[in-house]
């Protein structure tokens, strides 16, 4: 099994550093503004240099093995980098796969209609440029009349809400 070494240089004080969840019992060594710790297994953790404020969320995953071919005509493939699909909208139909590679940030909403649709990858679907109910779709992922819709591993940044301003 592989071990991962993480080093983080923080502008915030590390005097009250928490690494959560506690079940992983991660005890970093701290030298001035650098915290160092090791992970022995895939996990998602919150690195909190100033208690619960300003966390750094780390998704430490197994290596991805089920990557669709970017040459497959039924695959819409976004590689690493920022992507802005036309009109901020991705339409998926039957037997299509949307793949967001690790490091991809796709600024869009999705409309899916049909059978055997897959949305996957380690990338980010980002709807934060739009206010709630004002994006290219009513919902960030708008699935209608779908059978066997599979969504796995993507990270979604949802449409923003102005409720906090009220």
Which residues fall in each region the model found?
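Short, small-residue-biased leader/transition segments that mark boundaries at the very start
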Residues: 2-6, 162-166
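N-terminal domain-start segments of secreted/luminal proteins
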Residues: 60-96
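Extracellular beta-strand-rich solenoid/capping regions of secreted or surface-exposed proteins
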Residues: 33-39, 83-97, 105-120, 128-149, ...
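Extended acidic/polar, glycine-enriched regions
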Residues: 27-69, 107-109
């Amino acid at each position: 099994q592989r071990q991962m070494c993480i080093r983080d240089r923080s502008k915030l004080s590390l005097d009250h550093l928490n690494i959560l969840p506690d079940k992983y019992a991660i005890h970093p060594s701290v030298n001035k503004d650098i915290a160092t710790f090791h992970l022995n297994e895939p996990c998602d953790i919150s690195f909190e240099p100033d208690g619960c404020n300003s966390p750094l969320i780390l998704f430490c995953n197994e290596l991805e093995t089920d990557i669709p071919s970017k040459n497959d005509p039924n695959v819409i493939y976004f590689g690493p980098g920022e992507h802005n699909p036309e009109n901020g909208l991705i339409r998926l139909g039957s037997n299509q796969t949307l793949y967001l590679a690790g490091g991809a940030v796709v600024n869009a909403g999705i409309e899916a209609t049909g059978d055997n649709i897959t949305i996957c990858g380690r990338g980010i679907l980002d709807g934060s440029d739009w206010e709630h109910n004002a994006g290219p779709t009513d919902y960030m992922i708008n699935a209608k009349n779908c059978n066997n819709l599979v969504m796995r591993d993507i990270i979604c940044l949802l449409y923003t809400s102005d409720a906090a301003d009220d």
